[in-house]
Amino acid sequence: MDYQKLENSLIDVIKEEQAKLGYRKEEIRLYYPLGSLNHFFDTNGNEEEMTELLKGFAVYTKERLGEVRYGNRGERFCFFIPPEGSEYVHIHTPEKEFIKELVALVGKHGCTMEDIRALFLHTEKKIHREAIANGEFDELIYFEDDTEDTYNYCFKDEGCHIIYHRFLPEDYADFEF
């Protein structure tokens, strides 16, 4: 079983968390819906089938993230990453400068959508940008040809600040915005 997409996602989420909150060598719990896990493995399994599929994940990630444990309640799966995993991500993965810059930018008072657009354009990568009128978000931006950052970034201007969420393209499509 190829667990690389799931491991990459866990690492990306931990990096984003560390950009927002700072690094601490501590256990982290990350939650994924069954649908997202099915996207990682290109499957359409139920909870029991996913539990079976994940049996080799701890062995696969042990050298990098430590003894990752997982459990589920219905279609909601929780991954327990030990302190060693948090430390590994902090020390051994390349810096995701873009996510750090984005987190810092949206954390500033007075951040605007123009500031967000400028940050994306500053990367000199080809981006896709579109207005969204779904009540949840105002704008969608993603990198068109970036194989490492494949997320869809969704932004909402709440008047006094900008919030964002990032989704894997398959998860974004599931929302049917």
Which functions belong to the PLM regions below?
Residues 38-67:
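Charge-enriched amphipathic alpha-helical scaffolds
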Residues 23-44, 96-106:
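Short glycine-rich, basic-tinged beta-strand/loop micro-motifs
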Residues 43, 144, 174-177:
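Long, compositionally biased intrinsically disordered regions
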Residues 2-29, 104:
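Positively charged, polyanion-binding regions of nucleic-acid-associated proteins
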Residues 159-177:
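A short, surface-exposed interaction/processing loop segment used at functional sites
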Residues 111-155, 167:
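A cross-family detector of function-defining hotspots
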